[in-house]
Amino acid sequence: MPCVQAQYSPSPPGSTYATQTYGSEYTTEIMNPDYTKLTMDLGSTGIMATATTSLPSFSTFMEGYPSSCELKPSCLYQMPPSGPRPLIKMEEGREHGYHHHHHHHHHHHHHQQQQPSIPPPSGPEDEVLPSTSMYFKQSPPSTPTTPGFPPQAGALWDDELPSAPGCIAPGPLLDPQMKAVPPMAAAARFPIFFKPSPPHPPAPSPAGGHHLGYDPTAAAALSLPLGAAAAAGSQAAALEGHPYGLPLAKRTATLTFPPLGLTASPTASSLLGESPSLPSPPNRSSSSGEGTCAVCGDNAACQHYGVRTCEGCKGFFKRTVQKNAKYVCLANKNCPVDKRRRNRCQYCRFQKCLSVGMVKEVVRTDSLKGRRGRLPSKPKSPLQQEPSQPSPPSPPICMMNALVRALTDATPRDLDYSRYCPTDQATAGTDAEHVQQFYNLLTASIDVSRSWAEKIPGFTDLPKEDQTLLIESAFLELFVLRLSIRSNTAEDKFVFCNGLVLHRLQCLRGFGEWLDSIKDFSLNLQSLNLDIQALACLSALSMITERHGLKEPKRVEELCTKITSSLKDHQRKGQALEPSEPKVLRALVELRKICTQGLQRIFYLKLEDLVPPPSVIDKLFLDTLPF
């Protein structure tokens, strides 16, 4: 910490009044172990001058001094901030003089502890400056600081200083034995302070990052620590006879400084032209307002085609729709799609775009050039519509989006290969175990079908009896259709609704010949190249159709018409990869034939009676019999 140091010799008789009066009080305080330990010696060669023009002459402070002066240049001194800090050295005859400051203000004593002889004053017009107005200014943030020394706020020394009758006797500053510094031209026009160190490289700053300065307004707030105002009044008369005639009765407040702190003072920062707090640079890793892409997980700033996606997935989806591109998955149609692997399988990436809800109808085509696509507004709920007006039918695009979301939600997210075995060991186990596995797979499919049907718009508006009848009548058709869509039958891999992956050999003993019919239907269905919209409509139409025993068949027929209209509208707008309506109708006919074979398989297992069927399967089997 840079500072000005001086050692004092025994005081002359004329300057020891404060020693005689307050010596006993401040001797015990200054020797208290709580005082800061500092080492200061101007004679050391380790102290070096860093500036020669930033301080005014010390002769400004020595006007009227009755001793001889020896000239020394004013400079800044720097000393290492580390090392042991012994107590302030007190020499005989001086240890009781000029220690009227608080123990945090020892820098004033350390700056003036050298003891050369002082020549007479350099000029009659020089004035004595009170040392109590010196304070510490905070360094700029680039200078490393010692745990906080908040500076005292005050104005700079910009005007000529008048005599301060209310200030305290400066003590050792007026020692006749002290050497004076030659005056400078404009010394009285500038404040006494240490200029801030350059930011690069950081150098130790005085007093833990603060600078010594003079503030004439601070003298009005500082005085000797007399302990009480009454003591000052009784001793004012005695001090009138002091050689320097500085009365003490006008200031009764004790001279105290705030304790050291770690935080920088905003007042000092404003004096140095700094902002109270320096804002930290923005963090580029996480920008506010950004989310993650619903397709690959990359950063996404806004929504594209109805879903928050990144620019890469937005462009991929747009190009695929505009060019009617056809993709083929080389794996099992469940490739991982993330930021690193999103370009590996275009088929799975496009299917995931559709599954998260990206709407192809919003993509501009040749008929919509120059216009920005807009998502259709959501239809008003029945409570928001006027009761006198009939509720208009839902727009086809809303029905299509709901069907796609329902189908994707029913698709298992993770595949379970724990039981997959393509070797001859797949046939291990008893016949009863394979039959029980067959029943378990059918039961799991029924639960998935119920949750999927509730997401179809208008299905929950039907009577409960009709809802149950439709689900139970179509449970085998839904089981076969989902199994055909998910499975990679070309490699004999069958993916069931719970994510379980089994080889054909593992299913053959439970499914029998019905498994081969399912495989053929799956190959034919995949050869049709139906998009996910057509598959969603195919799944809905396989359940929502005319059934014997419906209470309100008219409403079921209306719902079926809405689904068919959505499929036609999807094809009419040119968004379908190929005309899908006739293909869907042919697939429905073939699907119902295969379900008849499934009923025959269940009937055969009941007759075999290896394992009793679950009650839900038994009930569904009896309800779906045509006779």
From Swiss-Prot:
Residues 395-624 form the NR LBD domain. Residues 1-112 are annotated as: Activation function (AF)-1 domain. Disruption phenotype: Nr4a3 homozygous knockout mice are viable and normal in appearance; however, abnormal hyperactive and partial bidirectional circling behavior is observed by 3 weeks of age in 15% of these mice. The circling behavior is interspersed with noncircling periods of feeding, grooming, and sleep. A small percentage of adult Nr4a3 homozygotes displayes brief freezing spells with tonic posturing that are exacerbated with handling. The overall food consumption of Nr4a3 homozygous knockout mice is higher. Residues 97-112 have a biased composition (Basic residues). A zinc finger (NR C4-type) spans 293-313, 329-353. Interacts with SIX3 (via homeobox); differentially regulates the transcriptional activities of NR4A3. Interacts with NCOA2; potentiates the activity of the NR4A3. Interacts with NCOA1, NCOA3, MED1 and KAT2B. Interacts with EP300 and NCOA2; mediates the recruitment of MED1 in the coactivator complex. Interacts with the constituents of DNA-PK heterotrimer PRKDC, XRCC6 and XRCC5; phosphorylates and prevents NR4A3 ubiquitinylation and degradation. Transcriptional activator that binds to regulatory elements in promoter regions in a cell- and response element (target)-specific manner. Induces gene expression by binding as monomers to the NR4A1 response element (NBRE) 5'-AAAAGGTCA-3' site and as homodimers to the Nur response element (NurRE) site in the promoter of their regulated target genes. Plays a role in the regulation of proliferation, survival and differentiation of many different cell types and also in metabolism and inflammation. This is Nuclear receptor subfamily 4 group A member 3. The lineage of its organism: Eukaryota, Metazoa, Chordata, Craniata, Vertebrata.
